Amino acid sequence: MFTLKKSLLLLFFLGTISLSLCQEERNADEEDGGEVTEEEVKRSFLDTLKNLAISAAKGAGQSVLSTLSCKLSKTC
């Protein structure tokens, strides 16, 4: 259970750093003129897909943790 918490925390931390870098890049692009290129559209789509996958993994992890907790404490 501790290992799962550490890995979820690591995913959250890496996602936060990635989001921060993307926001900095967007701000720099806005200062340059605000034109959206095809590469930026792809990057935005992949970033959204990645965030969706991370949130799904977090939800699944929480579900597994609650089930394991229930079974270990024999309160199910």
From Swiss-Prot:
Antimicrobial peptide. Residues 1-22 form the signal peptide. It is found in: Secreted. Residues 23-41 form a propeptide. Belongs to the frog skin active peptide (FSAP) family. Brevinin subfamily. Keywords: Amphibian defense peptide, Antimicrobial, Cleavage on pair of basic residues, Disulfide bond, Secreted, Signal. One of its GO terms (biological process) is defense response to Gram-positive bacterium. The lineage of its organism: Eukaryota, Metazoa, Chordata, Craniata, Vertebrata. InterPro entries: Antimicrobial_frog_2 (IPR012521), Frog_antimicrobial_propeptide (IPR004275). GO terms for cellular component: extracellular region. Its main location: secreted. Expressed by the skin glands. It comes from the Eukaryota. Disulfide bonds join 70-76. This is Lividin-2.
